Amino acid sequence: MTEAKLTRGHSCVPCQHRKIRCNGQTPCAYCIRTGKECVRMRVSPSHSRNARLNHRRLTAAQTGSPSGDGQVIVSGDQRRYVEDNKLWKSLGDEMQGKDVSPDPERPPLRTRTDTPSTEVNLIFSHQRPTSISVKYPSAVHSFQLWQVFISNVHPLTKILHGPTVQKDILETFSEPTSTPGPTEALIFAIYLVAVVSLTDAECRSRFGEPRKDLLARYCNATEVALSKADFLRSTDLRVLQAFTLHLLSLRHICDHDILWLLTGLATRMGQRMGLHRESSLKDLPPFEAELRRRVWWQIVILDGRASQLTGASMNPNMQLYGDTQQPINLSDADLVPSASTIPQPSPITTDMLFCKVRIEIGVWMIEQKCLLGSESESSTTGKAKFFKAIDELERHIEEKYLANMDKELPLNLLTAYLARSAVCQLRLSVYHPIHRPERASDLSAEQIDMLLENSLEVIRYDILSHSTPALQCYLWHIANFFPFETFVLLISTLSGRPAGQVVDTAWEVIDQVYEHHPSFVSDTSDPLYWALGNITLKAWDQRVTSARTRGITVPRELPCIANLVHARATMARASSQQPSTTDVSGPATPQSLLLAQEAPVDYLGGLGTTNELASQTDLGMATGEELLGMMKGVDVDWDFWQQLLDGNGHDARARDDQETFYFSSFINKA
């Protein structure tokens, strides 16, 4: 056996894959023990990177792309990017070295009304910068919050470099009052989003305080720190990172229209710094440039999701998002601030996997907006092209990211669920009646077959995400993406088909959804949840009635049905006990409350147990002809559902915190 050779390179590929410490020898101890080939990634030569940059600059010059028309104005650590502005560009050389952005460490500039921007802030109202010192947690709690962030949040965002920020946090333990303003804003934003990722029970167990109190404290501290850093005029990357994390926290309780405006603000802040242009990053160290790419693409994802929730259209023009390259597939351990070059993308999955897949799917959706034009909406050819593009996307994601990943790692598992669910939802989007209500009755047997198969698949992935113990740390994120449109479609298709294997399987899936989302039953004040319960009870009632009419065995009542009936009966009794002087000008009680009062007498409560999730082989359980009557069995007002979905999207946990989570005007009062 040859003598082990000590190396100074990165961890070997097998150790990176298993996320364990490599002892730095060739072969290393792990590879010797497991018999694996001990290989290390090669660092790309600098000339390759320069060649790519030169090629992009040449391409931009030949095509007239605005990516090469901008200019970076630098003053110390401050960087401002200007483009398509003849005045600023003509004076660019004269401005080099001039303070074009305020220094967060000195008194802020005065506005024309002689009011300090840090004292009267357009976004956060009046703040008191001197009060932030009392918001710092103890050293023990501070490090616990950091560990929660690294475990629950960082793998899903990747907008900062973990090892670097950890040093900053450790330095605050000894002298927190001397922490630079931008760093302080970033640290408190980390604390805030870490608390958002925890349950109330976890907060009480770890920190001895209710979750709502911790949220209020760190939200206020983050806003104060951002105001102190004069974030509206800052070009410091740490300030933008802090604001982006703050937006991630706000999306759990914030009014969607306001959140969309705030993500637009983050987009403008990034554009001012040139994050959307690859040419603005060429003179930065490779580490800094890569970090800016990560921040920019997370902002693009945030803004795109906010646009969906508000019903705003997404401009298919890619120039809106610039030409910044996607971040490369590297773990934090492979990014070294002092490195003169960036290593080649890892040939294996890294902790960037989730973000990489989200970015690739997001970019694909933006590009395909052009394909989903009038042609695809009105012609068979357009739909065929779109389905072919979806198949190609699915094949690309599977082969590049999912085929060889370690399925034992929770992040990889979540990524697989996300990617496969997204592909199914893309297929559903072509024929989903909620997008074309006037054509809901014109669907063919094959189209209904496809709708049911893919809707079941999407809902199953949500159930798997909630029922897998290893993914509990990511539920704060998963809860924001429940596929309401798909769930409504699944329930509505069952109303016209009361019996059969496919229906039995679908109802078991529906029951598990209610099991993992108890707020769908308990939160009777939410109009969307109330409507979901009504359409579920209506579909179940049709199933029971049909069984009796045909003289077959009445299906066993599911727990979700018993719970929905009980919730409505309880609300009906409470309403009947209200004084007759009740103000009738308020929100009306949903009309279908009568369904609970008129429910069949054999609703005895859910005494049975929920079956395990059906196997994937159950997806093709019925032919399109058998399913053809499903869409005609219930009269669904898809415009009504679209209005409900546009006005909803909060997680029940976040809704419970609204009474005490102080975000001034950000709270959705609905």
Curated annotation (Swiss-Prot):
Its keywords, alphabetically, are: DNA-binding, Metal-binding, Nucleus, Transcription, Transcription regulation, Zinc
Subcellular location(s) per record: Nucleus
Q: What is its main location?
A: nucleus
Highest taxon listed in the record's lineage: Eukaryota
Q: Pfam family of this protein, just one? A: Fungal_trans
Q: Provide the GO biological process annotations.
A: DNA-templated transcription
Residue ranges: DNA binding: 12-38
* Example of a GO MF term: zinc ion binding
Q: Which PROSITE patterns match?
A: ZN2_CY6_FUNGAL_2
Q: What induces it?
A: Expression is regulated by the aurofusarin biosynthesis cluster-specific transcription facto aurR1/GIP2.
The Gene Ontology CC terms held by the record are: nucleus
Q: Which intervals of the chain are annotated as region Disordered?
A: 57-76, 92-115
Skewed-composition ranges (Basic and acidic residues) = 92-113
Functional note: Transcription factor that may participate in the regulation of the expression of the gene cluster that mediates the biosynthesis of aurofusarin, a red mycelium pigment which is acting as a mycotoxin.
Would you tell me the protein name for this molecule? Answer: Aurofusarin cluster transcription factor aurR2
Per the UniProt entry, what species is this protein from, by scientific name?
Answer: Gibberella zeae (strain ATCC MYA-4620 / CBS 123657 / FGSC 9075 / NRRL 31084 / PH-1)
Q: Which gene encodes it?
A: aurR2
